[in-house]
Amino acid sequence: MKNTILILFTAFIALLGFFGMSAEALADPKADPLAGPNPDADPEAINLKAIAALARNY
């Protein structure tokens, strides 16, 4: 049972990679693919912007 779930999960991830879907595209499917990252859908982008703002202040 555990092996079956692992195989299905791996196949699902492989299909996502095959069709070029990234984690951000899954998080914000209505986003324009040519636009920059959406900070509302990508919490990592918010952290990078905050770190960059702190670095500029020092």
UniProtKB/Swiss-Prot annotation:
GO cellular component: extracellular region
Tissue-by-tissue expression: Expressed by the venom gland.
Compartment(s) of residence: Secreted
Biological processes annotated in GO: defense response to bacterium; defense response to fungus; innate immune response; killing of cells of another organism
UniProt signal peptide: 1-27
Keywords, comma-separated and alphabetical: Antibiotic, Antimicrobial, Fungicide, Immunity, Innate immunity, Repeat, Secreted, Signal
Main location group: secreted
Residue ranges listed under propeptide: 28-45
AXPX repeat feature ranges: 27-30, 31-34, 35-38, 41-44
Entry function: The synthetic peptide shows antimicrobial activities against Gram-negative bacteria (but not against all strains tested), Gram-positive bacteria (all strains tested) and the fungi C.albicans (but not C.parapsilosis). Exhibits little hemolytic activity against washed human erythrocytes.
Family, per entry: Belongs to the MCD family. Mastoparan subfamily.
Protein name per the record: Mastoparan-VT7
